[in-house]
């Protein structure tokens, strides 16, 4: 297998395409080493949330590639009772079986179209992790159908330019939304993804509650806890899906206009307590502590320091945060911009505070 090399990730060893022969696009089996953080955070999430669910979970990864994500779930989370791996590529299935063997992990392995498999698994899974190259949109309806009456659905989206509205027609066509230009466009892109997941969930009579959502360089990622209830789905759509208006100031609205982005998720992007317990595991703890603080701000946008510049000068992030807190405003840094912060205050309220320190 000179086309493959042995790699290590987390507590697993596995065969992956030889990077000296292939890039990630030409490799016979898909594996992206740049997604290690994604996989590690997913393991931590399943370890924390899966324990709360009682363990012994049936976990399905319908787009498995080398199988490393699912294998790490079993080895490192301690909550997987049954693992289901799948890939449309026969070569990938062969590699998955070898990787299961060298790690001593058992799994049901399929060579199916992802949607076909998920439909066959209707109502059987506690966790479905959709991690495609590109958009998760084609797989989400089937993912929720494969779920039991409650469980977790995770989705990765690498089509970030579409989600942030850089390609308006494709955004509308693929996600049914319009995203306007704004200083906080990355948060709108993330909320666009979560909002789409929520609307698809509702179409299958599920209500969702985000556990972990974030942006990382070239992708957005969200993991949501879903409960089957038509009434709760109706309530969720009414409460947590809407529009964000931007005309320097920001506001949440239920009406679409030339100034609004949406429909997007306007509720919490994640559970602060989940991020807290994940951080205690020690891996990516600084990032997770940042998310914990960020999730505690309810307003669905962030501010950037240059918005409050006077004569071309703006306060440092530390000065701005300290001033807001002295004024009794809860504020937190955002992981989506080095000069950005979230605050439980309107643009005008933030402006009045920061003008005193510029």
Swiss-Prot record:
Q: Pfam families, per this entry?
A: TRM (PF02005)
> Annotated Gene Ontology MF terms?
tRNA (guanine(26)-N2)-dimethyltransferase activity; tRNA binding
Q: Which GO terms describe its biological process?
A: tRNA N2-guanine methylation
Q: Which domain of life is it from?
A: Archaea
Under Enzyme Commission nomenclature, its number is 2.1.1.216
List the catalysed reactions.
guanosine(26) in tRNA + 2 S-adenosyl-L-methionine = N(2)-dimethylguanosine(26) in tRNA + 2 S-adenosyl-L-homocysteine + 2 H(+)
Q: InterPro entries from the xrefs?
A: SAM-dependent_MTases_sf (IPR029063), Trm1 (IPR002905), TRM1_arc_bac (IPR022923), tRNA_met_Trm1_C (IPR042296)
Which enzyme type, at the first EC level?
A: transferase
Q: Which residues form the Trm1 methyltransferase domain?
A: 5-354
Q: Which sites bind S-adenosyl-L-methionine?
A: 39, 69, 87, 113-114
Supply the alphabetized keyword list.
Answer: Methyltransferase, RNA-binding, S-adenosyl-L-methionine, Transferase, tRNA processing, tRNA-binding
Question: What PANTHER family does the database record attribute to this sequence?
Answer: N 2 ,N 2 -DIMETHYLGUANOSINE TRNA METHYLTRANSFERASE, TRNA (GUANINE(26)-N(2))-DIMETHYLTRANSFERASE
**Similarity comment: family membership:** Belongs to the class I-like SAM-binding methyltransferase superfamily. Trm1 family.
Q: What does this protein do?
A: Dimethylates a single guanine residue at position 26 of a number of tRNAs using S-adenosyl-L-methionine as donor of the methyl groups.
By what name is this protein known?
A: tRNA (guanine(26)-N(2))-dimethyltransferase
Q: Which organism is it from?
A: Pyrobaculum calidifontis (strain DSM 21063 / JCM 11548 / VA1)
